[in-house]
Curated annotation (Swiss-Prot):
It comes from the Bacteria. One of its GO terms (molecular function) is RNA binding. The active site is at D52 (nucleophile). Homodimer. The gene is truA. Formation of pseudouridine at positions 38, 39 and 40 in the anticodon stem and loop of transfer RNAs. Gene3D superfamilies: Pseudouridine synthase I, catalytic domain, C-terminal subdomain, Pseudouridine synthase I, catalytic domain, N-terminal subdomain. This is tRNA pseudouridine synthase A. HAMAP family: TruA (MF_00171). It comes from Solibacter usitatus (strain Ellin6076).
Length: 240
């Protein structure tokens, strides 16, 4: 049995997230159907994280085990020929049998993109949160840095993840920055791991700070702002 690690990019817009859902098009489901068809039996494809519906990935990491002796580069080409155009395997490699893309990860980086100009191109709109309204971006950048360090992120988890018993909500954020480009605000965060909706809820909280609704910019608020739309979020990288 061979363990194969793949790095893939995808446009999350057409899909219902990463995780298999009966009757719905998901990244994991499509990969398992294709690889399982090549293997001649069901194959479980594990991912480094379960991106939500509409969230994009620049370099998601996944892994699966097969008996097929096909060289990894030929495997990459064969799977890409069968994948929809919105999903592409960037590279594939053989790894140790016990590798797990989620449990072996030591850090992940996400990026959230907000488009700030009044007119957003229709070719950019699917990949940004268009927010042309007034915001104090300096306040937002100050609060972004308060998320660095080890914290209990329970207020920033989705309600179903927030209520999960016995699961720690403590995460370590190594860096949390907000940068301005000519037309965009880009929030970039690198951490040990992330809860469901955590990055999008942090962005919603930064927006509340930009509106002047958060007084203390040097510590985490007791509650998050509204969850920012999924389409502005990108999984950038996973480190091992």
């Amino acid at each position: 049995m061979r363990r194969i690690r793949i790095y893939l990019a995808y446009d999350g817009g057409p899909f219902h997230g990463w995780q298999v859902q009966p009757g719905l098009a998901t990244i994991q489901g499509i990969l398992e159907e294709i690889v399982g068809g090549m293997e001649g039996k069901p194959v479980h494809v594990a991912g480094s994280g379960r991106t939500d519906a509409g969230v994009h990935a620049l370099a998601q990491v996944a892994a699966f085990s097969i008996e097929n002796p096909i060289p990894v580069e030929n495997l990459r080409r064969a799977v890409n020929r069968l994948l929809p155009p919105a999903i592409r395997i960037l590279c594939a490699e053989e790894v140790q049998a016990d590798f797990h893309p989620r449990f072996d990860a030591v850090a992940k980086t996400y990026e959230y993109r907000m488009f700030r100009d009044e007119v957003c191109s229709p070719f950019e709109w699917p990949y940004v949160y268009h927010h042309p309204y007034p915001l104090d971006e300096a306040r937002m950048a100050t609060l972004a840095r308060a998320f660095e360090g080890e914290h209990d992120f329970t207020p920033f988890a989705a309600s179903d993840a927030r209520d999960a018993e016995g699961k720690s909500k403590v995460r370590t954020i190594f860096s949390s920055t907000l940068d301005r480009t000519p037309q965009r605000l880009v929030y970039r965060v690198r951490g040990s791991g992330f809860l469901k909706h955590m990055v999008r809820n942090i962005v919603g909280t930064l927006i509340e700070a930009g509106r002047g609704n958060i007084a203390d910019l040097n510590s985490l608020p007791a509650r998050s702002g509204a969850t920012a739309p999924a389409k502005g979020l990108f999984q950038v990288s996973v480190e091992y």
